[in-house]
């Protein structure tokens, strides 16, 4: 199929297209794509089956590379203002409970401290923007509001993707609105940003391959207004971001972006058991409300293809990772901005025939790399958790030995999750049809970043 239909704006004006790009799925990836296309003057429509953004804590951190991208879009300061305040420590703990001395304390800089380090660095070894703790239920409405400000972007919630057919000139997508009526939207290109269960990917017959259903956990969102202010509780750990519980249920507590909301992950059989786990971990009487509880599965999967004709995949529709390392949504943001400028170039007449071909070449290798990075990180956490022994909480020589052993292993292995700057910044596009290829090149590691001017690197 021809990549270049001419000037897409002319097609819209002539009535041949309803929109230049149809985006299916208004999560953070789809909304990032809509915002970037809109800022480039590309007419796009983004549809979402849900009636409104949901209050669900699917992600909780924009990494350094995503914040650099949002800075370029003029959104970084708005995201920081909406997220966790900059003075809160990002420390990580391994604990028995919140009222007992931590087994391990891994200190990490707050956003304010990280920004000061960035400002003081002049050798290119630091990102332009450090990370920002912000939950998806905060980020999504922010990106939606920004997209709605752009005259070239149409945002439609309560609009479900049903099917699509493509021809030489575009894509005809059938959608269904809340009242049950169907309509056809014609676009030059379509992008499926519709999550791991992606109806777009399934219709295209593109398979996900890798390791699926590795583990089942439940995730609950709690509101507890007093917990953050009460920390430290007795001899317990100080204020931080993650509290990993040394138990046989893979339990960990995460502070979300308001200091009043926390998520708890654990292997449980019921909502009531999840409440009990929260009380055991917090270990002090506090008023709380469990706002949601749902099961999720750990997957390490990659789509065979990121494109079929005029239809593309981005985000979780193309790759699924375990949240360890924070490479899910953040990888999708990279997909969105790589595809955005290429679609704009072709639609506006200054991009050549090979430009859109480069999207899959470039981004699928990063998806594959980040699936590997997630495997590396989750393997580290699995390794230290395997050191759990039932006597670990006992005041006895055997209990002390169990605590010391687990802490020593966690001190090595938990860092694989929390120190991933190389995976965030150090990737390089190899074999792209639009990048000059040189043999060799630097080796990029997951945990460390070395700045380079090698072609295809950040």
Where is each model-derived feature located?
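A conserved short coil-to-beta-strand element within the FAD-binding core of flavoproteins
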Residues: 157-171
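Glycine-rich FAD pyrophosphate-binding loop
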Residues: 38-59
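Conserved mid-domain beta->alpha element of the FAD-binding
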Residues: 25-34, 143, 192, 290-376
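Core beta-strand elements of the Rossmann-like FAD/NAD(P) dinucleotide-binding domain
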Residues: 17-19, 179-189
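Extreme N-terminal leader/targeting segments of oxidoreductases
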Residues: 1-22, 36-40
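Active-site-adjacent segment of FAD-dependent monooxygenases/related oxidoreductases
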Residues: 55-58, 62-146, 245-246, 256
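C-terminal helical "tail/cap" subdomain of flavin- and related membrane-associated enzymes
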Residues: 344-457
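Conserved FAD-binding catalytic core of PHBH/FMO-like flavoproteins
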Residues: 145, 189, 193-300
């Amino acid at each position: 199929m021809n990549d270049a239909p001419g000037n897409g704006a002319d097609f819209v004006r002539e009535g041949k297209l309803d929109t230049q790009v149809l985006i299916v799925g208004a999560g953070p990836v789809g909304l990032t794509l809509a915002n970037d296309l809109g800022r480039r003057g590309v007419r796009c429509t983004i549809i979402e089956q849900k009636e409104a953004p949901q209050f669900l804590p699917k992600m909780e951190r924009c990494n350094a590379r995503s914040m650099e991208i949002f800075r370029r879009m003029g959104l970084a300061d708005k995201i920081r203002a909406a997220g966790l305040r900059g003075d809160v420590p990002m420390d990580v703990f391994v604990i028995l409970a919140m009222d007992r001395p931590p087994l391990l304390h891994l200190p990490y800089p707050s956003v304010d401290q990280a920004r000061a380090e960035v400002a003081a660095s002049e050798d290119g070894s630091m990102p332009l923007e450090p990370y920002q703790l912000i939950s998806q239920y905060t980020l999504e409405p922010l990106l939606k509001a920004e997209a709605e400000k752009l005259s070239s972007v149409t945002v439609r919630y309560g609009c479900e993707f049903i099917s699509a057919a493509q021809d030489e000139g575009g894509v005809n997508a059938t959608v269904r609105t809340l009242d049950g009526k169907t309509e056809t939207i014609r676009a030059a290109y379509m992008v499926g940003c519709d999550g791991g269960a992606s109806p777009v990917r399934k219709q295209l017959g593109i398979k996900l391959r890798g390791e699926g259903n590795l583990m089942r956990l439940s995730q609950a969102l709690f509101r507890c207004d007093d917990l953050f202010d009460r920390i430290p509780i007795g001899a317990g750990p100080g204020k931080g971001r993650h509290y990993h519980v040394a138990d046989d249920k893979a339990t960990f507590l995460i502070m979300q972006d308001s200091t009043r909301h926390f998520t708890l992950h654990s292997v449980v059989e019921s909502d009531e058991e999840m409440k009990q786990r929260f009380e055991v971990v917090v270990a002090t009487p506090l008023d709380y409300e469990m706002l949601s509880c749902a099961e999720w599965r750990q997957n390490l999967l990659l789509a065979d293809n990121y494109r079929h004709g005029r239809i593309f995949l981005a985000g979780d529709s193309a790759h699924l990772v375990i949240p360890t390392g924070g490479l899910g949504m953040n990888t999708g943001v990279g997909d969105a901005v790589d595809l955005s400028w290429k679609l704009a170039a072709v639609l506006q007449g200054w991009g050549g025939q090979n430009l859109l071909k480069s999207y899959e070449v470039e981004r699928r290798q990063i998806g594959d790399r980040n699936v590997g990075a997630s495997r590396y990180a989750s393997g580290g956490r699995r390794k230290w958790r395997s050191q759990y022994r039932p006597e670990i909480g006992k005041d006895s020589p055997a209990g002390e030995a169990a605590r010391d052993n687990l802490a020593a292993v966690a001190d090595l292995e938990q860092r694989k999750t929390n120190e991933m700057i190389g995976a965030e910044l150090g990737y390089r596009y190899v074999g792209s049809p639009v990048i000059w290829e040189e043999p060799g090149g630097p080796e990029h590691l997951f945990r460390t970043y070395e700045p380079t001017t090698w072609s295809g690197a950040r």
